[in-house]
Amino acid sequence: MSDKSIKMQAKVLKMFSTDKYELELLENKVIIKGHISGKMRIHKIRILPGDIVDVEISPHDLSNGRITYRHK
C-alpha cells in the first residue's frame, strides 16, 4: 500500500481460510475484512482467532485491510 495507508491494531475474530480474516479494530470496534501480507505468507506465519495484529487500511476502501504483523 502507499505511504498514505492507515495503520491500526486489530483483534482477529474469525478465520475464513488460511489468509482471509474478520478483524475488530481496537481503537473504534469497527469490524473489517483482512488478508495477510505476502511476506507473512512466504514465512508461513500463522494467525489464530484472538491474536492481536497490525493492519494497514487503504483510505479508499475502509472495509478491507492487510495484516502486516502479529504481536506475540
Swiss-Prot record:
InterPro entries: NA-bd_OB-fold, RNA-binding_domain_S1_IF1, TIF_IF1. Pfam families: eIF-1a. Keywords: Cytoplasm, Initiation factor, Protein biosynthesis, RNA-binding, rRNA-binding. One of its GO terms (molecular function) is ribosome binding. Signal peptide: none annotated. One of its GO terms (cellular component) is cytosol. It is found in: Cytoplasm. Residues 1-72 form the S1-like domain. PANTHER family: TRANSLATION INITIATION FACTOR IF-1, CHLOROPLASTIC (PTHR33370:SF1). Component of the 30S ribosomal translation pre-initiation complex which assembles on the 30S ribosome in the order IF-2 and IF-3, IF-1 and N-formylmethionyl-tRNA(fMet); mRNA recruitment can occur at any time during PIC assembly. Belongs to the IF-1 family. One of the essential components for the initiation of protein synthesis. Stabilizes the binding of IF-2 and IF-3 on the 30S subunit to which N-formylmethionyl-tRNA(fMet) subsequently binds. Helps modulate mRNA selection, yielding the 30S pre-initiation complex (PIC). Upon addition of the 50S ribosomal subunit IF-1, IF-2 and IF-3 are released leaving the mature 70S translation initiation complex. This is Translation initiation factor IF-1.
